[in-house]
């Protein structure tokens, strides 16, 4: 199955945006979730966990700070990969003036649904460009 970014909704938040390209609810037979996350400059995704799924983060571009399992933060940059076991608390912050672009997976998929309840969520329909706002 081919999925184009133009055919996928954009979830926009105060800290950045996400496009989920593959989810169990959107792609028949899929058991994992895969998407692109953009963390805006100087922003971040606060401490949280995914009780039922491991997460893998691959840094496409940019730099930031990552915390895993309430441990000490460490630097992440283009080419780095971070594995987060199921249930482990973690956070990701962009520490530069450029966007931090990530590929994120959840296994098993479905944990992305929790973001639908985020108070700062704005959902942009497929094909509509999400407006970026400086905080």
Task: Place the predicted regions along the sequence by residue.
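A short, N-terminal "cap"/entry segment at the start of jelly-roll beta-barrel domains
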Residues: 1-32, 46, 117-135
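Conserved hydrophobic/aromatic beta-strand scaffold that supports enzyme active sites
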Residues: 10, 20, 34-38, 56, ...
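A short beta-strand-loop-beta hairpin characteristic of the jelly-roll/cupin
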Residues: 44, 51-78, 88
